[in-house]
């Protein structure tokens, strides 16, 4: 009898353990990488050294045709984390004067991390998850169950100036700041210093994230940890050992460094590499020299490899804590970046290099070793993580779950991926302050919406008037663009005026009206 009771006790314990294991919610490690284009080995860039992200990709799903909603930091992140498109959330620019624009525009919206918090998760963030200009001092305090970690403004081996560690650069910028605090001196666009990884912000933050993972692994609740790396955003600064991974003379330059033939003037307003040209030693107009192009590409690649090493620290922390098999890892870039393509060095374009982003999801028991060319958007991440974690999806979400694609990579969920990019007519809009917008005033702009189908890209430009409280789009079409990636993968020529593409153009316009029904009827 005693033996029977013992066996029954063991059986009950085993069943209880199995039940709790089945019911356990997966953790989420949410890794945002600022300005990362799909320049990774797992995306076919064989010359890039990204072994750790590539290894993670082999165990997860790589979405090779993923697109951001806006090719600009702040609006892209608000769109993804709110689950609402820019036309639904009203955020199109990096804000300048208006603070906490997320809750100003969307006071009641439940963000992605907030939804997980509301469902019993410990939610924590460090680094650049939201763009800091769009949220409160707590990085949207209601989204996190623990305070936002923002102590990495200065790296451990010294404060640096805006992240620089070169002593001469630091001294020069410090002196200039003393003389003219309101107008700080520009630093160089790139830096290679022989310092440890933790000397720069992202390396310091990664080490804090490792400690956070190990502490969270001991908690009874599941966690949602968001880590936002700042590189490869300008300036391209990384420890020298990552620069040395590359032979600068052998680095590939952009194959086509001009605007597409026949592209409308609206498409050529923003791409003047304005962000880059604000740095010291960069000419204010005209073509970037080949020598500087190679330095910049070397710097961008070094930053990618640097971040790759930091991602590895986080993944190893999951493994060492024994929670890797019950943790979903999501790696994404907020927008694309031109490394000389179309003669542009920066973001904020409706072209492929401006809108296409990396998206990799490794999840337990689904999507291992999957690659999919199905069209996806960053809007899809919110519902996807809900599905993978077994949570209900908020009714306001505009994206679609990618879980079906992870199970069957040929599954199609979108007819087209939608992105949009606005340009500002500086003559119509004098409310430009330091290259940024005074969004308290009316901004006269042009908005370009783009549809990316498996073969084509259609862009439609219209006049827009944007304020902090409303956005009005005109009916008049200012310009259209059409690109065929089967015959012209580099977007060399706008085909919208070609007779042989008249039928395709008509089909794309019809699809545009179908997918963007909130816009006023066009007048051509």
Q: What do these predicted regions represent?
A:
Residues 2-4, 21-481, 489-510, 514-520, ...:
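Formylglycine-dependent sulfatase
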Residues 4-13:
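Sec-dependent N-terminal signal peptides
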Residues 12-24:
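Bacterial Sec-dependent signal peptides at the C-terminal "C-region" and cleavage site
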């Amino acid at each position: 009898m005693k033996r029977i009771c013992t066996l029954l006790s063991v059986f009950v314990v085993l069943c209880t353990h199995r039940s709790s294991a089945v019911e356990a919610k997966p953790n989420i490690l949410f890794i945002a990488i600022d300005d990362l284009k799909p320049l990774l080995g797992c995306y076919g860039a064989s010359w890039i050294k990204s072994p750790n992200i590539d290894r993670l990709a082999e165990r997860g799903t790589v979405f090779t045709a993923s697109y951001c909603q806006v090719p600009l930091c702040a609006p892209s992140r608000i769109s993804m984390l709110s689950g609402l498109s820019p036309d639904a959330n009203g955020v199109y620019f990096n804000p300048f004067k208006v603070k906490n624009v997320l809750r100003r525009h969307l006071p009641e919206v439940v963000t992605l991390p907030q939804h997980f918090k509301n469902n019993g998760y410990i939610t924590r963030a460090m680094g650049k998850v939201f763009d800091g200009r769009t949220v409160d001092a707590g990085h949207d305090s209601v989204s996190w169950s623990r305070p936002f970690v923002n102590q990495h403004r200065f790296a451990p081996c010294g404060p640096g100036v805006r992240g620089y560690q070169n002593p001469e650069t630091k001294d020069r910028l410090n002196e200039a700041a003393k003389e003219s605090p309101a107008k700080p001196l520009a630093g160089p666009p790139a830096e290679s210093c022989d310092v440890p990884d933790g000397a720069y912000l992202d390396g310091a933050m990664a080490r804090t994230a490792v400690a956070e993972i190990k502490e969270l692994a001991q908690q009874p609740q599941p966690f949602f940890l968001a880590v936002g790396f700042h590189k490869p955003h300008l300036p391209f600064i990384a420890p020298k050992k990552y620069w040395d991974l590359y032979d600068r003379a052998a680095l590939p330059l952009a194959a086509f460094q001009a605007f597409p033939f026949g592209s409308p003037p609206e498409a050529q307003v923003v791409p003047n590499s304005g962000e880059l040209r604000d740095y010291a030693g960069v000419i204010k107009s005209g073509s970037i020299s080949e020598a500087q192009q190679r330095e910049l590409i070397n710097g961008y690649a070094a930053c990618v490899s640097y971040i790759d090493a930091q991602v590895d620290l986080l993944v190893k922390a999951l493994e060492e804590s024994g929670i890797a098999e019950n943790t979903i890892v999501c790696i994404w870039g907020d927008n694309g970046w031109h490394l000389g393509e179309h003669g542009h060095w920066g973001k904020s374009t409706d072209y492929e290099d401006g809108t296409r982003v990396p998206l990799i999801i490794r999840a337990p028991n689904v999507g291992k070793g999957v690659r999919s060319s199905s069209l996806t958007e960053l809007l899809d991440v919110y519902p996807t993580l809900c599905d993978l974690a077994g949570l209900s999806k908020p009714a306001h979400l505009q994206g679609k779950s990618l879980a079906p694609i992870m199970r069957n990579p040929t599954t199609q969920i979108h007819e087209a991926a939608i992105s949009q990019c606005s340009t500002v007519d500086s003559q119509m809009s004098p409310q430009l302050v330091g290259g940024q917008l005074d969004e308290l005033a009316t901004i006269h702009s042009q908005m370009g919406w783009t549809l990316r189908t498996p073969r084509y890209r259609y862009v439609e430009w219209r006049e827009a008037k944007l304020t902090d409280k409303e956005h009005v789009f005109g009916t008049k079409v200012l310009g259209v663009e059409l690109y065929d990636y089967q015959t012209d993968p580099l977007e060399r020529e706008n085909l919208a005026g070609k007779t042989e593409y008249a039928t395709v153009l008509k089909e794309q316009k019809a699809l545009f009206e179908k997918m963007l029904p909130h816009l006023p009827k066009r007048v051509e």
